[in-house]
Amino acid sequence: IGGFSRYMEHVGASSALFRVFEKPLKHIHNPYLLLGAAFIVEQIMVIFVPSHAGLGLLLMCTLYPILVRSGVSPLSALGVIGCCQFLDVGPGSGNANMAAQVAGMDVSEYFVYYQLPLFIALVVILTFVHMFVQAWWDKREGWKFDPKNVQTFAGTKPAVDVKEAPKIYAILPVIPLFLIIFFSKVA
């Protein structure tokens, strides 16, 4: 997944993905609202993608460029992505399977009745914590968004000019996510 993520940035696919979402995202004037929404989306993905490293790299390929190009500081975007697996939840989680086995119950029952209520409450709380704490730190650090230097924030420069990368490339970064969900028990 690491090589795939790097290649997507190299060919400009991450930039093409942002261009697809650029118009709807212009209606969100506060980048920290987008940061909170991104945290909720990634927490939903945690249930389906139990691999910590895999999900982190997938989010770096898809979510990070969108957040940074929307005005979120790179450190705030990384803070949210780094916190994506703060709880090991879901029926695909090894810890949930072991806990359900020790408790003598079905893993889906354990997930729905014991993990999910706590998980939902924590996600709601941490969404607001991320929004306010990341905004506070960015203000303290003197973060100013400069759209001209977005590639500097992202840390890489694609081999293809961002404006020249075909919009069809936007589907490339999300292919692994679709494959993971399609071939899981959810599908």
Model-derived segments and spans:
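Short, amphipathic, aromatic/basic-enriched membrane-interface segments that mark the entry/exit
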Residues: 22-30, 83, 161-166
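Hydrophobic, membrane-facing alpha-helical anchors
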Residues: 11-15, 32-34, 74-76, 139-154
